[in-house]
Amino acid sequence: MGGRKWQSIKRQKARVDAQKGKTTTQLSRAIIVAARQGIPDPAGNFQLRTAIEKARAAGVPNDSIDRAIAKGAGTYEDGESNYEEMRYEGYGPGGVAVLIEALTDNRNRTAADLRAAFSKKGGNLGETGCVSWMFSQKGVIRLVGELEEEKLLEALLEGEGESYEWLDEEDGGGVEVFSAVNQLENLNQVLQNHGFTIAETELRWLPENTIEIAEPDQAKALMQMIDTLESLDDVQSVTSNFELTEELLALAG
C-alpha cells in the first residue's frame, strides 16, 4: 500500500508528537465534543472511549477527563463547552496541500490564527474544498506486542480491514491497520476479540499522492509552519501531502 506515501506521514507525525504532543486543552476538547454528540458513557460511545484513551495515554489527569465528559453532557456548565468541529484547508510553501481539523468556540479567532500561521511561512489559508479532494479519511489502529501475521490477516478479513503496514521502532513499532471510516469500531472490536493489544485508534486523513520536497529552505519553512499550526489549542490535527527524505527531515528540525 504505497509505502513511501505512508512513511512520509508517519515521520512527520512522529516528529511533531515527540516535540509537543497534544495539550490537555486539545485532548479535553475532543472528549467534550464526543460526549456531546453521543451518550456521555464511554461504554456505549466509541468516539468518546477513543478520546478518553488518548487523553489517558498522554497523562491527562482523571479529574480533567471527568470534567470534560461532564461539560459535554451538559452537567458542568462554565461557558467554555460550546465547541464545534471545523475543517480548514490551505497551501503551504510551494503549493503543498494542508488539511486541518479543529475544535473551536470562536470561528473568527481560529481562522485568524490559522491565516497568520500560514502567511508567516509563505502559505495561505484557502477556501473550503480547495485541497480536501486530495485526501481520503481512514480508520487507523496501531497494534503492539506479539504480532503474528497469519492471525492478523484472519482478524482483518473478519473485521473488514483494508490493509496494514509494519512500523519501524522509530515510528513506535508494531503495525498499523487501515479501514473504512464506518468499519473502524467493528475492526477495533474484532482485533480485541482476537487478543491483539491496541495502542491507538483514530481517524486520519491520508494524501492520495505526495509532493517530493528537495529544497532545504522549503522543507524547513514547511515543518516550522506545521509546528506552529499544531501548537494552536484549537487545532486537533494537521495533515499535508509533502514528502521529505530523511536527510531533509533532519535539516528541517
Swiss-Prot record:
Localisation: Cytoplasm
Q: Identify the main location.
A: cytoplasm
Keywords, sorted A to Z: Cytoplasm, DNA-binding, Transcription, Transcription regulation
Q: Which GO terms describe its molecular function?
A: DNA binding
Q: Which is one Pfam family of this protein?
A: TACO1_YebC_N
Tell me which InterPro entries the record gives: Integrase-like_N, TACO1_YebC-like_2nd/3rd_dom, TACO1_YebC_N, Transcrip_reg_TACO1-like, Transcrip_reg_TACO1-like_dom3, YebC-like
The family note in this entry says: Belongs to the TACO1 family.
Q: What is this protein called?
A: Probable transcriptional regulatory protein slr0989
Organism this protein belongs to: Synechocystis sp. (strain ATCC 27184 / PCC 6803 / Kazusa)
